[in-house]
């Protein structure tokens, strides 16, 4: 089983879409391994998105991600990373395929509801940013 990390971003929480998005994720065959609601500071958001620090949108991204609560989750499924990227759709909801999470729920490229890891290696690193080893342990249920 492969794992990936997702974050339901502050716009998702603000629009009260947590349940609808999780329902779509679970119906696509993903199992939620770990989940929490948290609020990132500008510093922690900056650390998480440090890979984008030289990009023009970095400041806005950090500000947005620290603007309210978010919900990071570790998900599990065969081919989790690629399948989840397909499920969430393109970064810009206007370009996202019909029926994808961003197509259904996102308003803009900047506030696009959800983050998904782009590789298995990054998924592991990103999961470690939010969850301890104990929190991410496999639970049979």
UniProtKB/Swiss-Prot annotation:
Keyword set, alphabetical order: ATP-binding, Cytoplasm, Kinase, Magnesium, Metal-binding, Nucleotide metabolism, Nucleotide-binding, Phosphoprotein, Transferase
Cellular localization per UniProt: Cytoplasm
Active site per database record: 115
Keyword Kinase listed: yes
Pfam families reported for this sequence: NDK
InterPro entries xref list: NDK-like_dom, NDK-like_dom_sf, Nucleoside_diP_kinase
Entry binding sites for ATP: 9, 57, 85, 91, 102, 112
EC number: 2.7.4.6
Gene3D superfamilies: Nucleoside diphosphate kinase-like domain
Catalytic activity, as annotated: a 2'-deoxyribonucleoside 5'-diphosphate + ATP = a 2'-deoxyribonucleoside 5'-triphosphate + ADP; a ribonucleoside 5'-diphosphate + ATP = a ribonucleoside 5'-triphosphate + ADP
Top-rank EC class of the record's enzyme: transferase
CDD domains from the UniProt entry: NDPk_I (cd04413)
Top-rank taxon: Bacteria
Principal place of residence: cytoplasm
Needed cofactors: Mg(2+)
SUPFAM superfamilies xref list: Nucleoside diphosphate kinase, NDK (SSF54919)
GO biological process: CTP biosynthetic process; GTP biosynthetic process; UTP biosynthetic process
Alphabetical list of PROSITE patterns matching this protein: NDPK_LIKE
GO molecular function, one term: nucleoside diphosphate kinase activity
GO cellular component annotations of the record: cytoplasm
Family: Belongs to the NDK family.
Function text: Major role in the synthesis of nucleoside triphosphates other than ATP. The ATP gamma phosphate is transferred to the NDP beta phosphate via a ping-pong mechanism, using a phosphorylated active-site intermediate.
The protein's assembly and partners: Homotetramer.
Protein name: Nucleoside diphosphate kinase
UniProt organism field: Prosthecochloris aestuarii (strain DSM 271 / SK 413)
Gene name of this polypeptide: ndk
